[in-house]
Amino acid sequence: MTDSIDKSGRGVNECKRCGRKQGLVRKYDIYLCRHCFREIAHEMGFEKYS
């Protein structure tokens, strides 16, 4: 087996919008980094209450 690829761990998933691997929001299968999520959360229907 040459060039085996890890399919587990924190670095496997990435942001759908920018490709960043840190600060990923995976809840509800969103898969956006926190920066992209803050930019488009309102368009997705999320509201800020406080």
Swiss-Prot record:
Q: How is the cofactor bound?
A: Binds 1 zinc ion per subunit.
Keyword check for Metal-binding: yes
Q: Which InterPro entries match?
A: Ribosomal_uS14 (IPR001209), Ribosomal_uS14_arc (IPR023676), Ribosomal_uS14_CS (IPR018271), RIbosomal_uS14_euk_arc (IPR039744), Ribosomal_uS14_sf (IPR043140)
Entry keyword set: Metal-binding, Ribonucleoprotein, Ribosomal protein, RNA-binding, rRNA-binding, Zinc
Give the protein's cofactors: Zn(2+)
For the ligand (Zn(2+)), the binding residues are 15, 18, 33, 36
GO CC annotations on file? cytosolic small ribosomal subunit
Say yes or no: keyword rRNA-binding present.
Answer: yes
Instruction: Please list the GO biological process terms of this entry.
Output: cytoplasmic translation
Which Pfam family would be a valid example here?
Answer: Ribosomal_S14
Q: Which domain of life is it from?
A: Archaea
Annotated Gene Ontology MF terms?
rRNA binding; structural constituent of ribosome; zinc ion binding
Q: Which family does it belong to?
A: Belongs to the universal ribosomal protein uS14 family. Zinc-binding uS14 subfamily.
Briefly, what is this protein's role? Binds 16S rRNA, required for the assembly of 30S particles.
Binding partners and assembly: Part of the 30S ribosomal subunit.
Name the record gives this protein: Small ribosomal subunit protein uS14
Organism in which the protein naturally occurs: Methanosarcina mazei (strain ATCC BAA-159 / DSM 3647 / Goe1 / Go1 / JCM 11833 / OCM 88) (Methanosarcina frisia)
In the UniProt record, the gene name given for this protein reads: rps14
